C-alpha cells in the first residue's frame, strides 16, 4: 500500500492514472465502435511533440493563454496522427491495427530527431532533450509539494462527458451502432464511415491531450523518454474497465498502482524491468 500511504505518494499515483484514464476514454470510443486503434502510444507522442513545440515558443512575457494553446496543440497533434490511420482505412481499406501500430514507431523517430537535432538544448551538456519549458507553460498543480495537476480534473470531466455521450445522446448510440452493425446502421440512416472517423479522431485527440498534459506537467520538457508505454497500457485499462467510463476510472487507478509497484520492485529488490 505504499502508493497511497502519504499525500505525496497519492499524488504520484494520480500522476500515473491521469494519462492512462484520458487515453483509455478515447480508446473506449474506438473499441465500442469496432475500430481497433492500437497506436495510441504514437498519438500520445505526437501530442507531446506538438504541445512541446508550442511550449518552446513561449518566453517569460507570454500570457496565460499559452496553456490552452499547448493543450489544443496536443489534441490536434494526436488527431492528425490518428487521422492518417482513418484516411488509409477509409480510402484503401488498410488495417487500422497495422497502420496505427506502425505509426507509433514513426512518431518516436520524429521525437528522437527533434530532441537529438533542431530542438536540442544547446546548454544541456549534449543530452538529447529540449530546454526546460517556461514556468508560465506548466499545468497548474492541485496540491503544494505534489506533481498532481489539473489534468486529473480534466480526466474525470472526460469520464463524465463520455458517459453522457455514450448513454444519453443519439450521436453516441449512432456511433456504437455504426461500428458494431454497419448493415443495421445503414438501414437506420447512420454512417459507418462517420463512425470510423469520429472514433479515431476522438481517440487520437484524447491521446494527444494526455501527451500535452504529460510534457507540460510532470516532465516539463521533451526527452526521448516521453514514450512511457501509456498508450499500450491504456488498452488494458479500457478492457479491465469494460469500456465503461466509470469502470475505467478504477482500472486506471489499479494500473497506476501496478506501475508504481513495479518501479519500487526494480529499485528496492533489483528485479529486472522485463518482469
Where are these regions (language model features)?
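Hydrophobic alpha-helical segments embedded in the membrane of multi-pass proteins
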Residues: 17-28, 43-45, 49, 79-83, ...
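Helix-loop-helix "hairpin" substructures at the membrane interface of multi-pass membrane proteins
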Residues: 60, 143-221, 245-246, 250
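Transmembrane helix-bundle core of multi-pass membrane transporters
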Residues: 3, 7-8, 96-168, 221, ...
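Transmembrane alpha-helical segments in multi-pass inner-membrane proteins
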Residues: 201-275
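Membrane-helix interface residues
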Residues: 34, 92-94, 169, 190, ...
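Single transmembrane alpha-helix segments in multi-pass membrane proteins
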Residues: 1-58, 71, 75, 79-97, ...
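Structural signal for membrane-spanning alpha-helices in multi-pass inner-membrane proteins
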Residues: 23, 27-31, 51-56, 86, ...
Amino acid at each position: 500500500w505504499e502508493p497511497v500511504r502519504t499525500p505525496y505518494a497519492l499524488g504520484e499515483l494520480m500522476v500515473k492514472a491521469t494519462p492512462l484514464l484520458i487515453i483509455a476514454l478515447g480508446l473506449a470510443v474506438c473499441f465500442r465502435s469496432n475500430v481497433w486503434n492500437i497506436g495510441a502510444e504514437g498519438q500520445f507522442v505526437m501530442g507531446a511533440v506538438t504541445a512541446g513545440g508550442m511550449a518552446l515558443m513561449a518566453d517569460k512575457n507570454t500570457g496565460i493563454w499559452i496553456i490552452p494553446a499547448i493543450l489544443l496543440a496536443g489534441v490536434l497533434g494526436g488527431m492528425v496522427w490518428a487521422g492518417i490511420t482513418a484516411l488509409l482505412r477509409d480510402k484503401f481499406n488498410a488495417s487500422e491495427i497495422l497502420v496505427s501500430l506502425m505509426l507509433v514507431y514513426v512518431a518516436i523517430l520524429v521525437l528522437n530527431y527533434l530532441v537529438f537535432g533542431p530542438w536540442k538544448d544547446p546548454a544541456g551538456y549534449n543530452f538529447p532533450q529540449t530546454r526546460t519549458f517556461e514556468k508560465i507553460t506548466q499545468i497548474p498543480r492541485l496540491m503544494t509539494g505534489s506533481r498532481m495537476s489539473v489534468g486529473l480534473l480534466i480526466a474525470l470531466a472526460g469520464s463524465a462527458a463520455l458517459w453522457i455521450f455514450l448513454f444519453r445522446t443519439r450521436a453516441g448510440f449512432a456511433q456504437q451502432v455504426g461500428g458494431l452493425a454497419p448493415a443495421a446502421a445503414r438501414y437506420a440512416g447512420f454512417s459507418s464511415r462517420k463512425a470510423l472517423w469520429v472514433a479515431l479522431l476522438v481517440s487520437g485527440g484524447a491521446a494527444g491531450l494526455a501527451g500535452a498534459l504529460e510534457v507540460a506537467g510532470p516532465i516539463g520538457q521533451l526527452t526521448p523518454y516521453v514514450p512511457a508505454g501509456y498508450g499500450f497500457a491504456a488498452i488494458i485499462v479500457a478492457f479491465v474497465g469494460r469500456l465503461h467510463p466509470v469502470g475505467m476510472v478504477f482500472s486506471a487507478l489499479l494500473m497506476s498502482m501496478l506501475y508504481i509497484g513495479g518501479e519500487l520492485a526494480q529499485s528496492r529488490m533489483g528485479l529486472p524491468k522485463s518482469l
